[in-house]
Amino acid sequence: MPRRREVPKREILPDPKFGNVELSKFMNVIMEGGKKAVAERIIYGALELIQKKHPDKDPLEAFTVAINNVKPMVEVKSRRVGGANYQVPVEVRPVRRLALSMRWLKEAARKRGEKSMAQRLANELLEATEGRGGAMKRRDEVHRMAEANKAFSHFRF
C-alpha cells in the first residue's frame, strides 16, 4: 500500500462486441502473456457456445448471473493474537468480490476436461448460473471456513 497518495484506478474500456466493462475485465483475467486476441477468442467462443446450447438464454446475462453467483460475501484472514494465529472472518470488499469470482471461474475452467478452453469456460459459466461447478465449490468452501471461524469475528481488523 502506498504511503504517500492513493493510486488512481485505471479505467477499463468496455469490450468491442457487447460493450460490457465486466466482460472486458474478465478478458484481462483470462489473458496470459499479453495475448488479448487469444483471450477475446476464448471468451467470445464460450459465449457463442452458450448461445448454441441454450438459444433462449442471453449469453451476456448468463455470464453476469454466473459472476454474481460465484462472488464471495465473506472470507477469512489470518490474524496473530498473543502468539496464536486466528482465521478471522471478514466481509469482502465489492472490487475484490468481483476479482475473486473472475479468478475462480478461470481456474475452475482450466481444471475441466473438455477439449478447448472456450468449451471449458462455457460449461463452467453454465454450471455457475445453476449454482454448481468448481467455482461455486470454491466459494462455498470459503464461506464454510468463515462460518466455522465465526467465533473469532470479534478480532476484527
From Swiss-Prot:
CC per GO annotation: small ribosomal subunit
Pfam families the UniProt entry points to: Ribosomal_S7 (PF00177)
One of the record's GO molecular function terms: structural constituent of ribosome
Statement: the UniProt record of this protein carries the keyword Membrane: no
Record keyword Ribosomal protein present: yes
Keywords tagged on the record: Ribonucleoprotein, Ribosomal protein, RNA-binding, rRNA-binding, tRNA-binding
GO biological process annotation, one example: translation
Record NCBIfam families: rpsG_bact
Function in brief: One of the primary rRNA binding proteins, it binds directly to 16S rRNA where it nucleates assembly of the head domain of the 30S subunit. Is located at the subunit interface close to the decoding center, probably blocks exit of the E-site tRNA.
UniProt subunit comment: Part of the 30S ribosomal subunit. Contacts proteins S9 and S11.
Family to which this protein belongs: Belongs to the universal ribosomal protein uS7 family.
Cited PANTHER family: RIBOSOMAL PROTEIN S7
Name by which UniProt lists this protein: Small ribosomal subunit protein uS7
Classification lineage: Bacteria, Pseudomonadati, Pseudomonadota, Betaproteobacteria, Burkholderiales
